[in-house]
C-alpha cells in the first residue's frame, strides 16, 4: 500500500533549510559561470536522441509522443547541450561556453540535480579550474583525482589487460600481467610521482605526460592521480577528473568527443553538495 504522502525511492524532496541551501548553491554557481562568460541553456526534459549516448538503455525512462515516436526523459545533459548548440542553434550564436542548472532522471525513479557546463573546443585545465572555483565558493575543497581514460584502453588493446579487471581494480590480476613496469604504473599516486617516466613504454609515457601537464596547469593543492582508473564512460576518451569529499563524489569532468565535436565539460552534483554543506553547518 502506497500512502498519499510517500515519494518514490530515488526522488528528491527539499524544504526549509535544505531548499534554501539548494537555492544558494545554484544562485552562486550561476553568477560565477555567468561572470566567466558562460551562456545559460535549459534543454527539454524530453529527448529523441538520449539513447544514442547509452550503450545500456536500462537507465532511460521511455515513453512515446503523439506519433508513437520513442522519447526519453533527460538522463544526460551533456550530449543534448552539445547537439543542440552545434546543430540546432548553429550560426545563431557565437558562444562556445554554456552552463545549465537542471536535473537528470533515470529509471526507475532516480532524480539528480546538476550544475554543469560545456565548452566547445575547450581545454581540460579551464574546465577543471572552473569546477574548483565553484566548489571553493560553497566552502569545500575536495580531493581532485585526475585520470586518463586512454591509458586503460592502451593496456587493454596493446598489453592484454582486461578492462573489466581495471574497472573492478583487481590489483592482483593487474599485477599478474607480464609487464615489467605495471607495478610502477599502479603505484603512481602523487603529482611528484610523475617526475620520472623513464620506465614506461612510449605510448603509456605519452598519456602520463598529458596528466603531468594538466596537473601543472590546474594548480590545485589537494590533487592525486589515478592512471589505472577506468569506468565505462559514454564519451570521455582522454583526461578526466573526479572530486571527492571523504567518499562522496561531488563533481566529475574532462575532455570528450560527441558526434565529432571536441569539448570539455563538468557536472557538479547538487544533491551531494547540499548534503556536504548542511553537514558542515551542523558540525559548527
Residue ranges with predicted function:
Residues 158-163, 239-242:
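Short, surface-exposed amphipathic charged segments that create phosphate/polyanion-binding patches used
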Residues 73, 146-147, 268:
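A conserved hydrophobic position in a structured secondary element of the catalytic/binding core
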Residues 67-82:
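Extended cationic-aromatic binding surfaces that line active-site or macromolecule-binding grooves
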Residues 42-60, 147-157, 222-224, 228-238:
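Beta-rich nucleic-acid/ligand-interaction surfaces
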Residues 18-39, 47-48, 78-80, 85-89, ...:
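Positively charged, Gly/Ser-enriched RNA/tRNA-binding surfaces
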Residues 61-65, 160-177:
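Acidic, His- and aromatic-enriched active-site or binding-groove loops in soluble protein domains
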Amino acid at each position: 500500500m502506497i500512502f498519499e504522502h510517500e515519494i518514490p525511492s530515488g526522488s528528491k524532496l527539499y524544504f526549509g533549510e535544505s531548499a534554501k541551501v539548494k537555492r544558494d548553491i545554484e544562485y552562486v554557481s550561476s553568477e560565477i559561470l555567468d561572470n566567466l562568460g558562460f551562456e545559460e541553456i535549459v534543454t527539454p526534459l524530453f529527448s529523441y536522441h538520449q539513447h544514442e549516448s547509452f550503450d545500456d538503455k536500462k537507465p532511460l525512462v521511455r515513453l512515446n509522443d503523439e506519433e508513437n515516436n520513442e522519447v526519453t526523459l533527460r538522463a544526460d545533459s551533456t550530449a543534448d547541450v552539445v547537439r543542440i548548440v552545434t546543430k540546432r542553434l548553429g550560426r545563431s550564436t557565437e558562444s562556445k561556453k554554456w552552463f545549465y542548472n537542471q536535473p537528470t532522471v533515470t529509471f526507475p525513479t532516480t532524480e539528480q540535480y546538476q550544475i554543469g557546463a560545456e565548452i566547445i573546443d575547450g581545454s581540460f585545465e579551464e574546465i577543471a579550474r572552473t569546477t574548483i572555483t565553484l566548489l571553493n565558493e560553497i566552502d569545500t575543497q575536495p580531493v581532485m583525482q585526475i585520470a586518463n581514460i586512454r591509458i586503460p584502453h592502451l593496456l587493454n588493446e596493446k598489453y592484454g589487460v582486461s578492462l573489466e579487471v581495471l574497472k573492478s581494480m583487481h590489483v592482483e590480476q593487474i599485477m599478474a600481467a607480464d609487464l615489467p613496469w605495471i607495478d610502477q604504473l599502479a603505484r603512481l599516486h602523487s603529482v611528484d610521482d610523475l617526475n620520472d617516466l623513464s620506465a614506461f613504454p612510449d605510448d603509456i609515457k605519452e598519456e602520463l605526460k598529458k596528466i603531468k601537464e594538466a596537473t601543472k596547469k590546474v594548480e590545485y593543492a589537494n590533487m592525486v592521480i589515478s592512471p589505472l582508473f577506468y569506468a565505462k564512460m559514454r564519451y570521455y576518451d582522454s583526461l578526466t577528473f573526479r572530486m571527492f569529499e571523504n567518499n562522496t563524489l561531488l563533481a566529475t569532468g574532462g575532455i570528450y568527443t560527441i558526434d565529432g565535436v571536441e569539448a570539455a565539460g563538468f557536472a557538479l552534483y547538487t544533491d551531494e553538495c547540499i548534503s556536504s554543506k548542511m553537514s558542515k553547518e551542523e558540525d559548527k
